[in-house]
A protein has these predicted regions:
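Terminal-region recognition feature
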Residues: 1-124
Length: 124
């Protein structure tokens, strides 16, 4: 059986559970190494209690981040978000799901206007 590599990790401790987000946020994963809503939901709701969410992510798919945001907002326990490196782009959406949001003095939260990319020829 193949081990799935994830950019998050749950740690259960006396205060509740701690979740580490470290990597790109994606709707689906081709290589099982992205933060995806489906897998995250399974792990979030397999236990209860308060949750601490550590974020260090450059962002990714805003729709996947929106799903994770909604899951954290619906979660019954207290959600504390801690940004210890970078919470950029779509990761900033997840950061806003916390009942409390804390940042290291050397961390960065980057929120930007929506952007898109298109390509093709003039006649397309």
């Amino acid at each position: 059986m193949r081990t799935i590599k994830k950019f998050w990790n749950w740690i259960k401790n006396e205060e509740g559970r701690t979740l580490y987000f470290d990597g790109y946020i994606a709707q689906d994963s081709w290589f099982d190494d992205d933060i995806t809503p489906k897998k995250f939901k399974e792990e979030l709701f397999e236990s209860d209690g308060d949750v601490i969410v550590w974020i260090n992510s450059p962002g990714g798919d805003v729709f996947a981040a929106s799903q994770i945001y909604n899951m954290l907002k619906e979660y019954k326990g207290k959600v504390t978000v801690k940004i210890d490196g970078l919470a950029a782009s779509a990761a900033s959406v997840i950061a806003m799901a916390g009942d409390e949001v804390l940042m290291s003095p050397v961390a960065m939260l980057m929120i930007h206007n929506p952007s898109t990319l298109i390509w093709g020829e003039e006649s397309d």
